[in-house]
From Swiss-Prot:
Keyword Disulfide bond among UniProt keywords: yes
Job description of the protein: Aerial growth, conidiation, and dispersal of filamentous fungi in the environment rely upon a capability of their secreting small amphipathic proteins called hydrophobins (HPBs) with low sequence identity. Class I can self-assemble into an outermost layer of rodlet bundles on aerial cell surfaces, conferring cellular hydrophobicity that supports fungal growth, development and dispersal; whereas Class II form highly ordered films at water-air interfaces through intermolecular interactions but contribute nothing to the rodlet structure.
Name of the protein this chain belongs to: Class II hydrophobin 3
Family designation: Belongs to the cerato-ulmin hydrophobin family.
Originating organism: Metarhizium robertsii (strain ARSEF 23 / ATCC MYA-3075)
Principal location listed in the UniProt entry: secreted
Annotated disulfide bonds: 28-77, 38-68, 39-51, 78-89
Length: 95
């Protein structure tokens, strides 16, 4: 019985271990702000309006900035959008 409890504990620890998946690749940091977006306005580096996914897959923050600049928008790393709006964002690294 103790062996089963120890095996379950080890299996749980292995499943809960962090991986190298960052969501946005090398564009955005892992965690909450992991979704690369192109936004028309980023206010105080926290609130973003009219955000859309980039038209191409960016390689890094500079590439995201260039992709967004083609449409006159700013590169941002956002929380998962709710109702099509990404409200909580920060400026993308390298942008």
């Amino acid at each position: 019985m103790k062996l089963l409890a120890v095996a379950a504990l080890l299996a749980g620890a292995a499943i809960a271990a962090p991986t190298s998946n960052t969501g946005g690749g090398s564009v955005c940091p892992s965690g909450l702000y992991s979704n690369p977006q192109c936004c028309s306005t980023v206010i105080i580096g926290v609130i973003a309006l009219d955000c859309k996914s980039p038209s191409e897959v960016p390689r890094d923050g500079t590439d995201l900035r260039n992709i967004c600049a083609k449409t006159g928008q700013k590169a941002a790393c956002c929380v998962i959008p709710v109702a099509g709006q990404a409200l909580l964002c920060e400026t993308a690294p390298g942008a």
